[in-house]
Amino acid sequence: MPTTRYFAQAPPFPADTPTIDLPIFSFSDLQSGNPTEGEMLFAACREWGFFLIDLHDSAEGRTLLHDAETMFDLDIELFSLDQATLDQYAYNAPKDLTGYKRMGALKTDDGKLDHMHLYNINQDDILGNRAPRTNAPPIEAHRPQIQNFIRHASSTLDVILKTLDDHLGLERGTLSKLSPLDQESETSVRLLCSPPHASGEANQARISLGGHTDIGTTTLLFQVIGGLQILPAGLENKMENWRFVRPMPGCALVNIGDALVEWTGIRAETECGVFGQAGEVSIHAEDPWREDTGAD
């Protein structure tokens, strides 16, 4: 997840927290087409649908880490705005999910209200594939930086999709062509913030964002504070079965989404959710739901 600057500001990850050991793959090895790394990545897609990519060892990976840190800076600036200002950019669910979702607008698995601010930035708006919309001032001021993040994140995900092409018997580039940057899609950069819980609140049992699977082809997630949990495939949706994903400096989490599962059948039905921790601000810069654009 981003560079060490943000990890240095975060509380230590609790030693007694139940975690899940996801595999970590070298982005440099995937770029070079290392067959062993590719085979293990394909196996992780089938078993978990989640894995970590170490971006340290690649020039392109380090560029993306820098971009992700810029998105974290934007996240802080954005969610420092007052509530009345943020509400001016509210999304229009379910018709249009672009824009701001205030904390407490959704119900979580336990019937309580969510504890997560969320802002979806539409890729087509940023890249000029459709008429520009008016976003919150910090987003408008950082359009060039968001565009860089989108392009570099897309290139990173393309390396993963080409690896999957190889193991699915497809021509290289087949899966990437379903999500071209120059055509309209529902791809988003999603910024999230879960404020600190009130003192004395039952934080471990508090669900910040309910369990779900992602709707697109792939998601690239950057996190610093360990609120993300995964429910392994086949286990009952009970609190004790969920496992935290420990954030790792310099790594990004990849999630295989529902669309790619439908097209390829490669993933077990693993869910994710976000749970709060005491005294922490959970900030995520999340690229893409990469959606089928309808391109031939």
Task: Report each predicted region and the residues it spans.
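Peripheral, non-catalytic segments flanking oxidoreductase cores
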Residues: 1-296
